[in-house]
UniProtKB/Swiss-Prot annotation:
Top-level taxon of the source organism: Bacteria
Function: Part of the Tol-Pal system, which plays a role in outer membrane invagination during cell division and is important for maintaining outer membrane integrity.
Disulphide bonds in the chain: none
InterPro entries from the UniProt entry: 6-blade_b-propeller_TolB-like, PD40
Primary location group: periplasm
The protein's name in its UniProt record: Tol-Pal system protein TolB
Entry's Gene Ontology BP terms: cell division
Subunit: The Tol-Pal system is composed of five core proteins: the inner membrane proteins TolA, TolQ and TolR, the periplasmic protein TolB and the outer membrane protein Pal. They form a network linking the inner and outer membranes and the peptidoglycan layer.
Pfam families: PD40
Record's subcellular location: Periplasm
Organism: Actinobacillus pleuropneumoniae
Keyword ATP-binding tagged: no
Amino acid sequence: CIKQILQIITILPDLASGGTEVLSSTFLDESPSISPNGIMVIYSSTKGTSKVLQLVSADGRFKANLPGAGGQFKFPAWSPYLTK
């Protein structure tokens, strides 16, 4: 279960224990989208005056900035990998 409190993305891995894992560290993170296999979360974040995409594993061990060609990134979503 994912919930967003003050735009800080958290994961609740064990609803019985209520334990949480903080996956982002600013109030400028929003629009999380969980991968179909539940392993990764992609979300938009603000860096300076631009929106960027951030990728983080559900356990918080892996974090990456996804490069873009500029512009504003909002509402990321997962889609199937297509080959020609």
